[in-house]
Regions:
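Walker A/P-loop
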Residues: 1-15
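Conserved Walker A/P-loop ATP-binding site and its immediately adjacent core
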Residues: 20-46, 50-63, 103-105
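Conserved nucleotide-binding/hydrolysis micro-motifs of P-loop NTPases
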Residues: 31-33, 58-61, 104-107, 130-131, ...
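Conserved helicase motor
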Residues: 53-84, 102-108, 131-134
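Substrate-gripping "pore-loop 1 plus following alpha2 helix"
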Residues: 77-82, 117, 131-145, 168-182
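Conserved helix/coil segment N-terminal to the catalytic DExD/H
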Residues: 84-120
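SF2 helicase catalytic motif II
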Residues: 105, 114-156, 160-163
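Interdomain helical connector at the RecA1-RecA2 junction of SF1/SF2 helicase-like NTPases
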Residues: 166-240
Length: 240
């Protein structure tokens, strides 16, 4: 668990290298984040690795906090596949291999591993892992089932761990709905490391935020209207 901006992407790469993982799966919620993570891993890696990206136009996710928005796999700067047979062939090969995939395409990984000759992953990294919580039985929870995606180790990373109250879990159970939170150690394991926002500020890893309050009252607003005072917006639009 690491606050946004403290280096989760590089940390996961270094974990992979320290674990000497030769077969790695990295799951991400959008094409934009997948592209960004692949670029950063390639830039910072201490060893080379072969890459296969698994995604399709149906796996496009909404990602508002990125510098680029990728709406189609045609906009990707690297080859992609959505064929389980190609995934199987890649995983059967030798060398240091990394598959980058969207969560939405993770069932394709599971389909590829139906072939018993396809080895287990040494390591699976589930980024933005809070997306794996909630109701089970969807593409985002495929990674939680060892019988679907076989892996020796799983690492779940997030800045915002999501949990559910005992009352909500009870009500969901009464309705026949399974709800999983990140506090379920049987599924997500124990917290390996936590760097909350406040601690990151203390360490100088993040800049402290400032809250600015601007107080106005009705007479002040009426005066502005009377004088047709111009207001400059962040987009440099003048409004009167």
């Amino acid at each position: 668990i690491m606050a946004c901006g403290t280096g989760k992407t590089f940390t996961t790469l270094w974990v992979k290298e320290r674990q000497f993982a030769k077969s790695t799966l990295v799951l991400l919620p959008s094409l934009s984040l997948l592209s960004q993570t692949l670029r950063e891993w390639t830039f910072a890696a201490n060893e080379t690795f072969d890459v296969l990206c698994v995604c399709s136009d149906q796996t496009v996710g909404k990602q508002s906090n990125t510098d680029e928005i990728i709406h189609s796999v045609k906009d990707m700067s690297f080859p992609v596949t959505s064929e389980p047979q190609e995934i199987s062939a890649f995983l059967k090969g030798d060398g240091n291999k990394v598959i980058f995939s969207t969560y939405q395409s993770s069932p394709l990984i599971a389909e590829a591993q139906i072939d018993t000759l396809v080895p287990d992953f040494d390591l699976v990294i589930a980024d933005e892992a809070h997306r794996c919580t909630g109701t089970t039985g969807n593409a985002f929870t495929t990674i939680l089932d060892q019988s679907l995606i076989r892996a020796n180790k799983r690492l779940f990373t997030t800045a915002t761990p999501r949990t559910y109250s005992a009352n909500l879990k009870k009500k969901s159970s009464e309705m026949g709905v399974d709800v999983t939170g990140m506090d379920d150690e049987a599924i997500f394991g124990q917290v390996l490391y936590a760097l909350p926002f406040g601690e990151a500020i203390k360490r100088g890893l993040l800049t402290d935020y400032q809250v600015v309050l601007v107080g106005v009252d009705n007479p002040m607003i009426a005066d502005w209207i009377q004088r047709r005072q111009l207001i400059q917006t962040d987009e440099n639009n003048a409004v009167d």
